[in-house]
Each structure stands twice: as structure tokens, then as C-alpha cells.
């Protein structure tokens, strides 16, 4: 417990919050080849590898993950949501923030239905999250 005199001299230090998606906080100036502070809701990147990972202890599955090199030069792991995907090496993808709780080190999601990523086929509910188009009415 500090004394009043210590508080008058130094004061309290505000705790700085850490970002949950730090790769989205950095930009890149290609002319000056310098990284800049530029927050963005999504970022574009190129897949360097696509693989499956097993989750942490109580869960069991093969989760689909892509390693993505972003336009700011940072390389991150991003989860591929939905059933089935068409991604491979050199696919151009859009990533957003959002971690996968049972995959350590995976802090980003790939946005389905944009750039080279196809939407989920035969998806009827929650279509907007998976980039699926509205099905034609059968009459």
C-alpha cells in the first residue's frame, strides 16, 4: 500500500490492454518499406500452407487451418470455418479477428465467400457467416 506522498509523486499507472488480434493493428507502407500503426477490421493475405490441427485436451477433431502471409508482412494462422473448403497454397483470402478456443495460436478466422474462398455448399441457416447464397425456391 503506497503512502499519500508516493501517490502524489508518482501517481497510478493505467493498465494497457493487449489486442486480441495484433496483426490487424499494423499496416505497411510499401514505398518507404516501413510498418505503420493502422487498425483494420479485416486484412487480405496469401495462404502459405493449408493443414489440419488437433485441438486441446477434452476435444477431439481435425480442425482446418491455413497459414496466411498478410499484406503487412506478418504471417498468422487462421481458422477455416464451415464444412469443406477450396483453399490451397497461393489462395488469396480475407481474414478477420476471432480466436478458436481449443486451438492454441489461432487468433483469426478466414472470411468465407470473398476473394478466392468459396462459400459453404448447401448451407441453409446462418448463411451470411459462411458466404452461402440464398437457394432458389423450388415450386
Swiss-Prot record:
Pfam annotation, one family: Ribosom_S12_S23
Name by which UniProt lists this protein: Small ribosomal subunit protein uS12
Modified residues (3-methylthioaspartic acid): 102
Reported function: With S4 and S5 plays an important role in translational accuracy.
GO biological process: translation
Subunit structure: Part of the 30S ribosomal subunit. Contacts proteins S8 and S17. May interact with IF1 in the 30S initiation complex.
Keywords annotated in UniProt: Methylation, Ribonucleoprotein, Ribosomal protein, RNA-binding, rRNA-binding, tRNA-binding
Gene behind this protein: rpsL
Sequence similarity: Belongs to the universal ribosomal protein uS12 family.
Organism: Alkaliphilus metalliredigens (strain QYMF)
Domain of life: Bacteria
GO molecular function per UniProt: rRNA binding; structural constituent of ribosome; tRNA binding
PANTHER family per record: 30S RIBOSOMAL PROTEIN S12 FAMILY MEMBER (PTHR11652)
Region of interest (Disordered), residue spans: 1-21
UniProt keyword Nucleotide-binding, yes or no: no
GO cellular component: small ribosomal subunit
Amino acid at each position: 500500500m503506497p503512502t499519500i506522498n508516493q501517490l502524489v509523486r508518482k501517481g497510478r499507472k493505467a493498465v494497457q490492454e493487449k489486442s486480441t488480434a495484433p496483426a490487424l493493428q499494423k499496416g505497411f507502407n510499401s514505398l518507404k518499406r516501413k510498418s505503420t500503426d493502422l487498425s483494420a477490421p479485416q486484412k487480405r493475405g496469401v495462404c502459405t500452407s493449408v493443414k489440419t490441427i488437433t485441438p486441446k485436451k477434452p476435444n477431439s477433431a481435425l480442425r482446418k487451418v491455413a497459414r496466411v502471409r498478410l499484406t503487412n508482412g506478418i504471417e498468422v494462422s487462421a481458422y477455416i470455418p464451415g464444412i469443406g473448403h477450396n483453399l490451397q497454397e497461393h489462395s488469396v483470402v480475407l481474414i478477420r479477428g476471432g480466436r478458436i478456443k481449443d486451438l492454441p495460436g489461432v487468433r483469426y478466422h478466414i472470411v468465407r465467400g470473398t476473394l478466392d474462398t468459396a462459400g459453404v455448399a448447401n448451407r441453409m441457416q446462418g448463411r451470411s457467416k459462411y458466404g452461402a447464397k440464398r437457394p432458389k425456391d423450388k415450386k
